[in-house]
A protein has these predicted regions:
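Membrane-proximal helix-turn-helix segments that form the acceptor-binding/catalytic region
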Residues: 23-25, 71-74, 128-147
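A short, well-ordered alpha-helix in the C-terminal region of glycosyltransferases
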Residues: 324, 331, 338-353, 359-365
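Aromatic "clamp/platform" in nucleotide-sugar-dependent glycosyltransferases that forms part
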Residues: 259, 278
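Conserved acidic donor-binding segment of nucleotide-sugar-dependent glycosyltransferases
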Residues: 309-311, 315-322, 331-337
């Protein structure tokens, strides 16, 4: 029985973004393992997935601690002897890629779901950090039997050029997919319009611009509600503070809902989806909104623009521009026929490009090819 080991930095993220892939592997007779920090979820036992607890901090930068993570992964790989290691998010694919090289893992999948703050931010410190990270990235992406999955073409072009990754290693898979049965198309609700933001409450998700746009629209005398669906991420330096979030609750047109599992239900009660992020891999919340038939307003940045068809399923606005964001939202508020047209087109896009069955099938094809190459 072939073994596949997933390495991710958050078990809840794995459950929300990769579980269908793992389930398909199990159904096909693979032995599937997950290594991650955080809680072991009940669903893992229910589906027959083996869980390995990692000591991994998403944001820690202590050199000794980071070296220990590589050693920890090396030990896990040598003890478990997986046929494929599939690593998702930055630290797993960086440190796991190095450990997999050391442990001579037969096949490696490195899933780049976004480049992170090191490649978003500017300034001397960030540029210096990139120089330090270059040899680690170079090593992590140098496995002879490896596939690197990107969610958008901007990220793939950047890393291919920066690291001289051979194009034969690269695959483009647009996001983690959406369950079209769970996220069904619905007509817009009647009554006061609702504009919904679904994401962690991080500055680089554009939450401040979303709140600012809500107040611009309120000052224009337009009575609509703005829903904020997501929690603080206090271990993340980009997280909004509790005090700032509390201040938003004073605005009459803003409703802080917090993290929710019933996103499909929330979209069914909404009219417009909005994510003014600074950069993404490919945001799951936007493809879920499309599946539900909601027009989207998002930023013209990598990942976000890949989740929509501009002026067909949604509208693109400049980054960090609350005025432009408010203008786009206001346009959709005032044009229900445009919202309906975009929502219908969004559902069609989700069915064509983002169906979970399509995404899972693309992963299975990658695994089969890697296993075949490992046996040569």
């Amino acid at each position: 029985m072939k073994k596949v080991l997933f390495v991710v930095n958050n078990s809840a993220f794995f459950a929300s973004h990769r579980l269908p892939v793992a389930q398909q592997l199990i159904e096909k007779g693979y032995e599937v393992h997950l290594a991650s920090p955080g809680a072991k979820l009940a669903i893992f036992d229910e589906m027959g997935l083996s869980y390995h607890k990692l000591k991994l901090s998403r944001k820690g930068m202590n050199p000794l601690s980071e070296i220990r993570i590589i050693w920890q992964l090396f030990k896990l790989f040598t003890d478990l002897q997986p046929d494929i290691v599939h690593m998702v998010t930055i630290k797993p694919y960086l440190y796991g890629g190095i450990a997999a090289k050391m442990a001579k893992v037969p096949a490696v999948v490195s899933a780049v779901s976004g480049l992170g703050v090191v490649f978003i931010a500017a300034g001397f410190k960030v540029k210096f950090l990139r120089v330090l990270l270059y040899p680690l990235y170079k090593l992590a992406f140098s496995h002879k039997n490896q596939v690197v999955i990107f969610q958008n073409s901007d990220d793939s072009v950047f890393l291919i050029n920066w690291l001289s990754i051979h194009p034969s290693k690269v695959r483009l898979i647009r996001g983690s997919g959406v369950n079209l049965t769970a996220y069904q198309y619905s007509i817009e609700p009647t009554g006061k319009l609702v504009i919904t933001f679904v994401a962690r409450l991080l500055a680089d998700k554009g939450i401040r611009e979303f709140i600012d746009a809500s107040q611009i629209i309120h000052s224009n005398g337009i009575e609509v509600d703005f829903w904020v669906v997501g929690d603080l991420d206090e271990g993340n330096p980009a997280s909004i503070t509790k005090e700032e979030m509390a201040s938003w609750k004073k605005f009459p047109n803003v409703k802080i809902i917090g993290f929710q599992n019933n996103v499909a239900d929330l979209y069914s009660k909404s009219n417009i989806a909005c994510l003014p992020s600074y950069r993404e891999g490919l945001p799951k919340s936007l493809i879920e909104a499309a599946a539900c038939g909601r027009a989207v307003v998002t930023t013209d940045v990598p990942g976000c623009r890949d989740a929509i068809e501009s002026n067909e399923t949604g509208m693109l606005v400049p980054i960090k521009n609350a005025v432009a964001l408010a203008d786009a939202i206001e346009y959709l508020i005032e044009n229900p026929d445009v919202r309906t047209r975009m929502g219908t087109a969004g559902r069609a896009l989700a069915e064509k490009e983002f169906a979970i069955e399509k995404i899972v099938a693309e992963h299975m094809k990658i695994y089969r090819k890697l296993l075949d190459q490992a046996e040569l």
